[in-house]
């Protein structure tokens, strides 16, 4: 049954490797609960997927697009870039002004430490215990 189904599908999808990818993807969709578009006739999911492709109840192009979307991890969104450089320039100036204002308001005073105080502090540190993890 499956061999005849594959031969029927080659007319719809010329590349057998692509056919395997599409049918496998559709079979996984059926396993996850997607509605089938033909009678099951006690066939397993891969055979049902091949029969759906052969009967053209599903478009191979739609399946291919769905497969691509299921494999994508990062989807780039095309946005207009014509107005973006002007906005970036003005927003970078605003950010610079905001940082300057914040720096004036939140001046943090650090304690000054002499070299002797620093050395005394370092001598007071306890070395970590050696273990055999390395």
UniProtKB/Swiss-Prot annotation:
Biological process terms from the Gene Ontology for this record are:
DNA-templated transcription
- Catalytic activity entry: RNA(n) + a ribonucleoside 5'-triphosphate = RNA(n+1) + diphosphate
> SMART domains per the record?
RNA_pol_Rpb6
Keywords (alphabetical) are: DNA-directed RNA polymerase, Nucleotidyltransferase, Transcription, Transferase
Might you give the EC number(s) for this enzyme?
Answer: 2.7.7.6
Looking up Gene3D superfamilies in the UniProt record yields: 3.90.940.10
Task: Please give the GO cellular component terms listed in this UniProt entry.
Answer: DNA-directed RNA polymerase complex
* GO MF annotation terms: DNA binding; DNA-directed RNA polymerase activity
Q: Which domain of life is it from?
A: Bacteria
Give any Pfam family that matches. Answer: RNA_pol_Rpb6
Q: What does this protein do?
A: Promotes RNA polymerase assembly. Latches the N- and C-terminal regions of the beta' subunit thereby facilitating its interaction with the beta and alpha subunits.
Summarize the subunit comment. The RNAP catalytic core consists of 2 alpha, 1 beta, 1 beta' and 1 omega subunit. When a sigma factor is associated with the core the holoenzyme is formed, which can initiate transcription.
Please state which protein family the record places this protein in: Belongs to the RNA polymerase subunit omega family.
NCBIfam families, alphabetized: rpoZ
Protein's name in the database: DNA-directed RNA polymerase subunit omega
Query: Can you name the source organism?
Result: Brucella anthropi (strain ATCC 49188 / DSM 6882 / CCUG 24695 / JCM 21032 / LMG 3331 / NBRC 15819 / NCTC 12168 / Alc 37)
Q: Which gene holds the coding sequence for this protein? A: rpoZ
């Amino acid at each position: 049954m499956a061999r005849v189904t594959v031969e029927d599908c080659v007319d719809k999808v010329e590349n057998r490797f692509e056919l395997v990818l599409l049918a496998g993807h559709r079979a996984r969709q059926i396993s996850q609960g997607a509605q089938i578009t033909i009678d099951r006739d006690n066939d397993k999911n891969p055979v049902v997927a091949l029969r759906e492709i052969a009967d053209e109840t599903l478009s191979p192009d739609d399946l291919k697009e769905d497969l691509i979307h299921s494999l994508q991890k990062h989807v780039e969104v095309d946005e207009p870039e014509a107005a973006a450089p002007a906005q970036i320039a003005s927003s970078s100036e605003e950010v610079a002004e905001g940082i300057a204002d914040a720096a004036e308001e939140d001046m943090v005073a650090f304690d000054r430490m002499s070299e002797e105080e620093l050395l005394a502090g370092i001598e007071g540190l306890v070395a970590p215990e050696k273990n055999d993890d390395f």
